[in-house]
């Protein structure tokens, strides 16, 4: 159980390991109603395959109420199209009685009186999926490496459930299921929104940074985009593109160019 404002960090300890996650509105559960993450509602609202740190960062329930917000994501490769793995999916491939994430969910949620399901909707963290040119749903080895993680912030009091995927018959876990670690931080801890990037496949990830001007620009807009490892304003409130364009032509403007990663010095001594 997690309180509103607390943080939920799901960590891939050894790399290339999927983890299924879902959360429930705790207050609604006490009233006998089951409101959990709805991947279809979420994709429709954020306009992406899954939320990422930034503007389109929240997972919603079927009532379009936010349940968690993605604060940090070191890998950026997940899935919201497939269900948590099921007993049937293994039986169809000849593996009868195989442990699976949907049954794990049922077991973990039993004490809350939540209805059991043969196939659970879930946020399939680290699962590397896609749809190819023949409209076939594909799955390959995860991109995640040891220590990669996703950090969420609870938007309500929640009941959370997580299952390290036990799939050992496909590349989903590199054919070798390993441990997932879930850590909870109290609201008093502060985490900035960050996306992890690697310069190449062998590099450690680097998280998006706030520029030296962020404390001022963030008071003028919440519309930030990631640019070369920095959060940069995309637009400012109460103006719009035409007003900003006119200001560039006719007035003096100040721009945060930190993402260019260079200094510009002007004035009489600039060439010395």
Provide a role label for each language-model segment.
Residues 1-196:
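Acidic, Ser/Thr/Pro
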Residues 185-272:
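Glycine/proline-enriched, intrinsically flexible loops and inter-domain linkers
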């Amino acid at each position: 159980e997690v309180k509103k404002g607390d943080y939920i960090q799901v960590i891939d300890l050894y790399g290339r390991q999927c983890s299924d996650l879902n959360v429930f509105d705790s207050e609604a559960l006490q009233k006998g109603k089951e409101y959990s993450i709805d991947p279809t509602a979420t994709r429709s609202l954020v306009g992406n395959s899954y939320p990422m740190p930034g503007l389109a960062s929240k997972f919603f329930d079927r009532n379009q109420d936010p349940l968690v917000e993605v604060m940090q994501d070191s890998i950026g490769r997940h899935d919201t199209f497939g269900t948590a793995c099921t007993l049937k999916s293994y039986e169809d491939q000849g593996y009868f009685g195989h442990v699976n994430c949907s049954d794990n969910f049922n077991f973990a949620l039993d004490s809350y009186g939540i209805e059991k399901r043969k196939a659970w909707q879930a946020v399939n963290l680290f699962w590397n999926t896609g749809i190819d040119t023949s409209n076939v749903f594909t799955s390959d080895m995860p991109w995640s490496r040891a220590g990669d993680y996703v950090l969420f912030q609870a938007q309500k009091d929640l009941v959370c459930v997580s299952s390290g995927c036990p799939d050992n018959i496909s590349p989903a876990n590199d054919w070798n299921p390993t441990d997932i670690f879930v850590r909870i931080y109290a609201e008093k801890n502060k985490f900035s929104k960050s996306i992890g990037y690697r310069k190449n496949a062998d590099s450690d990830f680097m998280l998006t940074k706030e520029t030296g001007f962020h404390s001022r620009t963030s008071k003028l807009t919440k519309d930030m985009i990631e640019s070369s490892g920095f959060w940069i304003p995309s637009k400012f409130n109460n103006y719009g593109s035409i007003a900003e364009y006119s200001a560039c032509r006719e007035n003096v403007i100040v721009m945060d160019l930190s993402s260019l990663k260079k200094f510009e010095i002007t004035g009489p001594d600039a060439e010395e």
